[in-house]
Amino acid sequence: MTEEIQNWMHKAFQMAQDALNNGEVPVGCLMVYDNQVVGKGRNEVNETKNATRHAEMVAIDQVLDWCEKNSKKSRDVFENIVLYVTVEPCIMCAGALRLLKIPLVVYGCRNERFGGCGSVLNVAGDNIPDTGTEFKYIGGYQAEKAVELLKTFYKQENPNAPRSKVRKKE
């Protein structure tokens, strides 16, 4: 792992830890443009009660704000961003990344339930007409660390789950 990737992934894991500390699925990400963070996010699904507030979507909103404040065309910025994220983007997020023409995603562990970079569907690389541009992805950076954070979260009881869905932990 290059020092640059290690540095950005370390910061993404800080975002994931913040998500965990706030009762969210521990996923964190950074969007890096011209060697600076222009968007960062962590899952905010539980606190906003909005199932679309994944780390990547939060970061996309921050990039749009950054572009507006810095008089940059968002299209030009997104086409030159590298996304560093602790877990493989889900199908929804991979679709958004593709539509925005983000060229490269570096992620930690695979997302075996919802992964959009090949674990479930290859939204990133399949030839899908009228859905943006394929993007490259590199997975496996600190995968064990990402999995441990996820295990920690799923060992807890989700206080936001409906009573009928709460499972007893053994």
Swiss-Prot record:
Zn(2+) binds at residues 54, 90, 93. SUPFAM superfamilies: Cytidine deaminase-like. Keywords: Hydrolase, Metal-binding, tRNA processing, Zinc. Its cofactor is Zn(2+). One of its GO terms (biological process) is tRNA wobble adenosine to inosine editing. It holds the Pfam family MafB19-deam. The keyword tRNA processing applies. The active site is at residue 56. GO terms for molecular function: tRNA-specific adenosine-34 deaminase activity; zinc ion binding. Residues 3-128 form the CMP/dCMP-type deaminase domain. The keyword Lipoprotein does not apply. It comes from the Eukaryota. Its EC number is 3.5.4.33. It catalyses: adenosine(34) in tRNA + H2O + H(+) = inosine(34) in tRNA + NH4(+). InterPro entries: APOBEC/CMP_deaminase_Zn-bd, CMP_dCMP_dom, Cytidine_deaminase-like, tRNA_aden_deaminase. Probably participates in deamination of adenosine-34 to inosine in many tRNAs. Belongs to the cytidine and deoxycytidylate deaminase family. ADAT2 subfamily. This is tRNA-specific adenosine deaminase 2.
